[in-house]
Amino acid sequence: TVIVNGVSKTYAMTGWRIGWLAAPKEVAKAIDSFQSHATSNPASVSQYAALAALNGSEDELIKMRDIFNDRRKFMIERIRRIEGLGCIEPDGAFYIMLVVDKLYGKRFNGRKINGSLDVADMLLEKGVAVVPGIAFGDDECVRLSYAISKEDIAAGLDRIEEFVKEVF
Protein backbone atom coordinates (compact mmCIF):
# COMPACT_ATOMS: atom_id res chain seq x y z
CA THR A 1 0.00 0.00 0.00
CA VAL A 2 1.19 3.48 -0.92
CA ILE A 3 -0.50 6.52 0.64
CA VAL A 4 0.08 10.00 -0.76
CA ASN A 5 -1.43 13.11 0.81
CA GLY A 6 -0.83 16.81 1.27
CA VAL A 7 -2.16 20.03 2.75
CA SER A 8 -3.56 21.54 -0.46
CA LYS A 9 -7.21 20.62 -0.16
CA THR A 10 -7.73 19.66 3.48
CA TYR A 11 -6.11 22.83 4.81
CA ALA A 12 -6.85 25.10 1.83
CA MET A 13 -3.11 25.49 1.25
CA THR A 14 -2.97 25.14 -2.51
CA GLY A 15 0.30 26.41 -3.89
CA TRP A 16 2.26 25.65 -0.71
CA ARG A 17 3.42 22.36 -2.28
CA ILE A 18 3.64 20.31 0.90
CA GLY A 19 2.86 16.62 0.73
CA TRP A 20 3.95 13.28 2.09
CA LEU A 21 4.04 9.61 1.30
CA ALA A 22 3.79 6.43 3.35
CA ALA A 23 4.96 3.26 1.63
CA PRO A 24 7.01 0.12 2.16
CA LYS A 25 10.68 1.01 2.66
CA GLU A 26 11.91 -0.19 -0.76
CA VAL A 27 9.12 1.67 -2.59
CA ALA A 28 9.73 4.84 -0.55
CA LYS A 29 13.46 4.71 -1.35
CA ALA A 30 12.79 4.43 -5.10
CA ILE A 31 10.30 7.30 -4.97
CA ASP A 32 12.71 9.41 -2.90
CA SER A 33 15.45 8.86 -5.46
CA PHE A 34 13.17 9.97 -8.29
CA GLN A 35 11.71 12.91 -6.36
CA SER A 36 15.13 14.27 -5.43
CA HIS A 37 15.90 14.65 -9.15
CA ALA A 38 12.49 16.01 -10.10
CA THR A 39 11.81 18.70 -7.50
CA SER A 40 13.57 20.71 -4.85
CA ASN A 41 12.73 21.14 -1.20
CA PRO A 42 9.74 23.25 -0.21
CA ALA A 43 10.43 26.59 1.44
CA SER A 44 10.85 26.44 5.21
CA VAL A 45 7.95 28.85 5.72
CA SER A 46 5.71 26.38 3.86
CA GLN A 47 6.94 23.54 6.03
CA TYR A 48 6.26 25.48 9.25
CA ALA A 49 2.82 26.53 8.00
CA ALA A 50 1.97 22.90 7.20
CA LEU A 51 3.19 21.82 10.63
CA ALA A 52 0.98 24.45 12.28
CA ALA A 53 -2.00 23.28 10.23
CA LEU A 54 -1.42 19.63 11.08
CA ASN A 55 -0.97 20.33 14.79
CA GLY A 56 -3.73 22.93 15.11
CA SER A 57 -7.39 22.73 16.03
CA GLU A 58 -9.75 21.11 13.55
CA ASP A 59 -12.57 23.56 14.35
CA GLU A 60 -11.89 25.65 11.25
CA LEU A 61 -11.61 22.50 9.11
CA ILE A 62 -15.04 21.39 10.26
CA LYS A 63 -16.52 24.81 9.41
CA MET A 64 -14.81 24.80 6.03
CA ARG A 65 -15.98 21.24 5.30
CA ASP A 66 -19.57 22.20 6.14
CA ILE A 67 -19.42 25.28 3.91
CA PHE A 68 -18.06 23.26 0.98
CA ASN A 69 -20.67 20.55 1.55
CA ASP A 70 -23.41 23.19 1.45
CA ARG A 71 -22.02 24.61 -1.81
CA ARG A 72 -21.74 21.10 -3.29
CA LYS A 73 -25.37 20.29 -2.46
CA PHE A 74 -26.52 23.66 -3.79
CA MET A 75 -24.65 23.15 -7.05
CA ILE A 76 -25.93 19.60 -7.58
CA GLU A 77 -29.56 20.60 -6.90
CA ARG A 78 -29.27 23.56 -9.28
CA ILE A 79 -27.67 21.47 -12.05
CA ARG A 80 -30.45 18.87 -11.79
CA ARG A 81 -32.94 21.62 -12.70
CA ILE A 82 -31.16 22.39 -16.00
CA GLU A 83 -32.72 20.28 -18.73
CA GLY A 84 -30.14 18.50 -20.88
CA LEU A 85 -27.38 18.45 -18.26
CA GLY A 86 -26.37 16.06 -15.52
CA CYS A 87 -23.52 15.77 -13.09
CA ILE A 88 -21.26 13.28 -11.42
CA GLU A 89 -21.40 13.77 -7.66
CA PRO A 90 -17.91 14.17 -6.23
CA ASP A 91 -16.40 11.99 -3.52
CA GLY A 92 -13.87 14.63 -2.51
CA ALA A 93 -12.16 17.91 -3.40
CA PHE A 94 -14.39 20.76 -4.57
CA TYR A 95 -15.14 19.94 -8.18
CA ILE A 96 -18.19 18.62 -9.99
CA MET A 97 -18.09 17.01 -13.39
CA LEU A 98 -20.94 18.51 -15.41
CA VAL A 99 -22.19 16.03 -18.03
CA VAL A 100 -22.64 17.97 -21.28
CA ASP A 101 -22.65 15.29 -23.99
CA LYS A 102 -26.33 15.92 -24.88
CA LEU A 103 -25.14 19.24 -26.33
CA TYR A 104 -22.86 17.51 -28.83
CA GLY A 105 -23.91 17.83 -32.45
CA LYS A 106 -25.98 20.91 -31.67
CA ARG A 107 -25.02 24.50 -32.52
CA PHE A 108 -24.22 27.65 -30.58
CA ASN A 109 -23.87 30.94 -32.49
CA GLY A 110 -23.59 28.97 -35.72
CA ARG A 111 -20.79 26.71 -34.48
CA LYS A 112 -21.19 22.98 -33.97
CA ILE A 113 -20.45 21.54 -30.52
CA ASN A 114 -18.17 18.53 -30.96
CA GLY A 115 -16.79 17.96 -27.47
CA SER A 116 -15.85 19.34 -24.07
CA LEU A 117 -13.28 21.75 -25.54
CA ASP A 118 -16.03 23.41 -27.58
CA VAL A 119 -18.34 23.61 -24.56
CA ALA A 120 -15.54 25.17 -22.47
CA ASP A 121 -14.78 27.77 -25.16
CA MET A 122 -18.45 28.63 -25.64
CA LEU A 123 -19.13 28.91 -21.90
CA LEU A 124 -16.16 31.26 -21.63
CA GLU A 125 -18.00 33.54 -24.06
CA LYS A 126 -20.84 33.52 -21.52
CA GLY A 127 -18.45 34.45 -18.71
CA VAL A 128 -18.11 30.98 -17.21
CA ALA A 129 -14.71 29.33 -16.84
CA VAL A 130 -14.68 25.52 -16.81
CA VAL A 131 -12.05 22.89 -17.52
CA PRO A 132 -12.77 20.56 -20.46
CA GLY A 133 -13.29 16.99 -19.32
CA ILE A 134 -10.96 15.74 -22.04
CA ALA A 135 -8.12 16.99 -19.81
CA PHE A 136 -9.17 14.26 -17.35
CA GLY A 137 -9.95 11.59 -19.94
CA ASP A 138 -13.72 12.23 -20.02
CA ASP A 139 -14.82 14.21 -23.04
CA GLU A 140 -18.49 13.98 -22.03
CA CYS A 141 -17.97 16.44 -19.14
CA VAL A 142 -16.58 19.78 -18.10
CA ARG A 143 -15.27 20.41 -14.59
CA LEU A 144 -16.84 23.04 -12.35
CA SER A 145 -15.43 24.28 -9.06
CA TYR A 146 -17.40 25.13 -5.95
CA ALA A 147 -14.40 26.75 -4.26
CA ILE A 148 -16.12 30.10 -4.85
CA SER A 149 -18.98 31.93 -3.15
CA LYS A 150 -22.51 30.59 -3.36
CA GLU A 151 -23.51 33.81 -5.15
CA ASP A 152 -20.85 33.25 -7.83
CA ILE A 153 -21.94 29.61 -8.18
CA ALA A 154 -25.55 30.72 -8.71
CA ALA A 155 -24.52 33.37 -11.26
CA GLY A 156 -22.38 30.87 -13.15
CA LEU A 157 -25.13 28.26 -13.23
CA ASP A 158 -27.60 30.90 -14.46
CA ARG A 159 -25.23 31.60 -17.35
CA ILE A 160 -24.81 27.89 -18.04
CA GLU A 161 -28.59 27.45 -18.10
CA GLU A 162 -28.92 30.39 -20.49
CA PHE A 163 -26.27 28.79 -22.74
CA VAL A 164 -28.09 25.44 -22.72
CA LYS A 165 -31.41 27.10 -23.61
CA GLU A 166 -29.74 28.85 -26.55
CA VAL A 167 -28.30 25.53 -27.74
CA PHE A 168 -31.60 23.63 -27.48
Question: What is each residue range found by the language model?
Answer:
Residues 1-168:
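PLP-dependent class I/II
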